[in-house]
Amino acid sequence: MTDLTACAHLNDYAKRALSLMDLTTLNDDDTDEKVIALCHQAKSPAGNTAAICIYPRFIPVARKALREQGTPEIRIATVTNFPHGNDDVAIALAETRAAIAYGADEVDVVFPYRALMAGNDKIGFELVKTCKEACAAANVLLKVIIETGELKQAHLIRQASEIAIKAGADFIKTSTGKVPVNATLESADIMIRTIRELGVGETVGFKPAGGVRTAEDAAQFLQLADQLMGEGWADARHFRFGASSLLASLLTTLGHQSNANSSGY
């Protein structure tokens, strides 16, 4: 492959990746102003991101900012049972209902991965199923974060993926971005293969999150999805990137100046 061809291919992947981003800020020092700035970045010179991902309390501010800048179609995702992944179903449900009441389009709930590691394969199903029922009633998408970097072992990653899917997850997501090891190609391979093997590729998507920082990183994940699921599967209904610093790299690759955050998640 020539350098020119390689560059053209990377540009193609960069364009795809940008349209699949859940542009994220989930920091303790987040403010209304930072969330509004994130909304502005989501309307990039190379096109809009699929969504933004923020804490629930900022949803009304973000909704107003997206509407005022003429991009009401950018979806708003938020997080619940985050980042700890506790096994209290009632609290996870209450947080999910609150997120829906704030106006979330999508909820990313953390699976009780520690319970699974301790041998409890029932509570995760109950938690996801309960949150899914609340989301489905409000036409809200549910993504389930299984925290692959903590599960570590392939059989646990597969088991958590399977439980989440069978309990009704619309997406399975690698990571919170709050642990040392986040999205890896190895965990992505296991999770996408699980989607394929369960025959749910039409209805269940995949989201790598944390650690996807460059256009080259994004291209590798998209190549994997294309190989396992066929070209065309990885659209915004079936594939998202959870990231913040990735946007700056994508814009640079596409020849745009960027004021996007180039550090972090």
From Swiss-Prot:
GO terms for biological process: 2-deoxyribose 1-phosphate catabolic process; carbohydrate catabolic process; deoxyribonucleotide catabolic process. Catalyzes a reversible aldol reaction between acetaldehyde and D-glyceraldehyde 3-phosphate to generate 2-deoxy-D-ribose 5-phosphate. GO terms for cellular component: cytoplasm. Keywords: Cytoplasm, Lyase, Schiff base. Belongs to the DeoC/FbaB aldolase family. DeoC type 2 subfamily. This is Deoxyribose-phosphate aldolase 2. SUPFAM superfamilies: Aldolase. CDD domains: DeoC. The lineage of its organism: Bacteria, Pseudomonadati, Pseudomonadota, Gammaproteobacteria, Enterobacterales. One of its GO terms (molecular function) is deoxyribose-phosphate aldolase activity. Its EC number is 4.1.2.4. It comes from Yersinia pestis. Transmembrane segments: none annotated. The keyword Cytoplasm applies.
